């Protein structure tokens, strides 16, 4: 079963998960510790994996920035 999809689009990578996750709270998206760490360390692979896990969407720019 595939949990997520990573698509390259021009200068960014889009990581998303089709189903909602337990990490999403009633106020909207809630960053997990793993995704927060990915934002700090700007690690594309970690951010993609974390985005799929928490059911959110992140853009991973070529210059290394991880943005919501």
Predicted stretch roles:
Residues 1-2, 61:
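Detector for methionine-enriched segments
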Residues 2-37, 66:
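Short aromatic-glycine-(Arg/Gly/Cys) micro-motifs in beta-strand/loop hairpins
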Residues 36-68:
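Short, mixed-charge low-complexity intrinsically disordered segments
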